[in-house]
Structures are given as structure tokens and as C-alpha cells.
Regions:
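ANL superfamily adenylate-forming
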Residues: 1-24, 141-142
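Conserved pre-ATP/AMP-binding loop-to-beta segment of ANL
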Residues: 17-35, 69
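Conserved adenylation A10 loop of the ANL superfamily
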Residues: 30-46, 168-171
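Conserved S/T- and glycine-rich ATP-binding loop of Class I adenylate-forming
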Residues: 36-39, 71, 86, 117, ...
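AMP-binding/adenylate-forming
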Residues: 47-58, 70-126
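Glycine-rich helix-loop-beta junction characteristic of Rossmann-like nucleotide cofactor-binding loops
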Residues: 61-66, 131-133
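Gly/Ser/Thr-rich phosphate-binding loop
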Residues: 129-184
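Short Gly/Pro-enriched turn/cap motifs at secondary-structure boundaries
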Residues: 186-193
Length: 193
């Protein structure tokens, strides 16, 4: 049994899916099924094992050197990016709040105490233009889904969070390599574990 709290925005549409995954995780299920995004062809169902999910979440936790954390999930929870945020919250035993995915995820949250967020490059660019003060409140921002621009474009606006470019796919249960753009790392580094 994991000790964490899940919260939902009023317009979040996948609460039943989240509750089913939480139930299955707490029952000890060993296999979970999600669909690929379809960016390289027709979406297909992928089986992710509990062992792989634990490795992915634990490797990310170790890479980010996390202590106290609270996740803001604004990605589709039935796809890898959002699904893994749920799995991380279960394994890390931290609070998570789910929001309806949009290109402007920070548009309606106001003041917040979230520490970690995963964004697509489109969401990140929009948030950087419109809500840099809210982005600055995060400790870690993970950007996945496509290549991102170099760090010079945001280093002048963001001085607090560590910004990570990630590389992964559904079949690997999220990212397998990360690059710290805040520290000007020049390459993606594989997660250890």
C-alpha cells in the first residue's frame, strides 16, 4: 500500500482511470497496459511490468536527488508521460494533482507549492512566455516528447528550477536518459540502475 494523496482539478476527465491504476498497484499487479502515442505509426498497446516501472521511477528519483516533493500532472495520464507521473507518486509516496492536459497548463493554477512537473516542449515554451514566475517555483521541470531549444533562451527567465531534457519511449516506461539544461550539460546521460 502506497501512502500518497491524489487530487484532481474540476475538469480532469480521467479520474476513474487513475483510481483503477492506484487500486491495481496497491493490489500488487505485475503488468500494466498503455498505448504508444502513435508518433511513429499506429498506436499499439504495450505491457509494462511492475519491475520496469519501479526501476524507471527509482532511477528518476535518484537522478533528481529528491527529498520532499509534490507533482503537478498536466499530461494525458493514459499515455506514458502522465502515466509515469502517477507511478512516480505511488513509488515516491508523494502528493500528486491531476489537471486536464492543455498547451497552457499553468494558466489556471495561480499560487502553488508543486516541486516537480513534466511538460511537452510546447507546454514549456508557452509557460515560459506567459508564466515564468510560476515556472520558477518548481524545483524540477522535465521536458520530453521532442527536442527542446538550447538553455540560453530560458536561463535568463528562470533562476530556480533544474530543467531536464529527457529521452525515452513507452516501451522503456518513460525516459532512459536525461540532460540537465540548467547546468548546460551537452549530452543526454543514461539513467543508472
Amino acid at each position: 500500500m502506497s501512502f500518497f494523496n491524489a487530487y484532481y482539478s474540476e475538469d480532469f476527465e480521467d479520474k476513474l482511470f487513475v483510481e483503477e491504476i492506484i487500486k491495481r498497484w496497491n493490489q500488487g499487479d505485475n503488468e500494466f497496459y498503455i498505448y504508444t502515442s502513435g508518433t511513429t505509426g499506429k498506436p499499439k498497446q504495450i505491457t509494462l511490468t511492475r519491475k520496469l516501472l519501479k526501476w524507471s521511477a527509482t532511477s528518476t528519483h535518484n537522478k533528481l536527488n529528491l527529498t520532499r516533493h509534490k507533482i503537478m500532472c498536466c499530461l494525458p495520464v493514459q499515455k506514458t508521460g502522465g502515466f509515469m507521473q502517477l507511478i512516480r507518486a505511488l513509488i515516491w509516496e508523494c502528493d500528486i494533482q491531476f489537471f486536464k492536459p492543455s498547451n497552457d497548463p499553468l494558466d489556471s493554477i495561480g499560487e502553488h507549492d508543486f516541486t516537480t512537473i513534466s511538460l511537452t516542449p510546447t507546454q514549456f515554451k508557452s509557460s515560459l512566455l506567459k508564466f515564468p514566475e510560476q515556472l520558477n517555483k518548481f524545483r524540477h521541470i522535465l521536458i520530453g516528447g521532442a527536442p527542446s531549444s538550447n538553455s540560453s533562451s530560458f536561463n535568463s527567465k528562470l533562476n530556480h528550477p533544474q530543467i531536464w531534457l529527457t529521452y525515452g519511449m513507452t516501451e522503456t516506461a518513460s525516459h532512459i536518459a536525461m540532460q540537465n539544461l540548467t547546468n548546460n550539460e551537452s549530452v543526454l546521460n543514461p539513467l543508472l540502475g
